[in-house]
UniProtKB/Swiss-Prot annotation:
A Pfam cross-reference name: Ribosomal_L36
One GO location term (cellular component): ribosome
Cofactor: Zn(2+)
PROSITE patterns: RIBOSOMAL_L36
UniProt keywords, alphabetically: Metal-binding, Ribonucleoprotein, Ribosomal protein, Zinc
Name of this chain's protein: Large ribosomal subunit protein bL36
Subunit composition and interactions: Part of the 50S ribosomal subunit.
Cofactor binding note of this UniProt entry: Binds 1 zinc ion per subunit.
Domain of life: Bacteria
Length: 37
């Protein structure tokens, strides 16, 4: 899980999702997981 000021989709399989007021990127590739913080 990378914590970043700006989250971006890295590949076509990445999805941007809002949970509990936070922005997440989830993907098949675990390296692409991100959270906005």
């Amino acid at each position: 899980m990378k914590v970043r000021a700006s989250v971006k989709r890295i590949c076509d399989k990445c999805k941007v999702i809002r949970r509990h007021g936070r922005v997440y990127v989830i993907c098949e590739n675990p390296k692409h997981k991100q959270r906005q913080g």
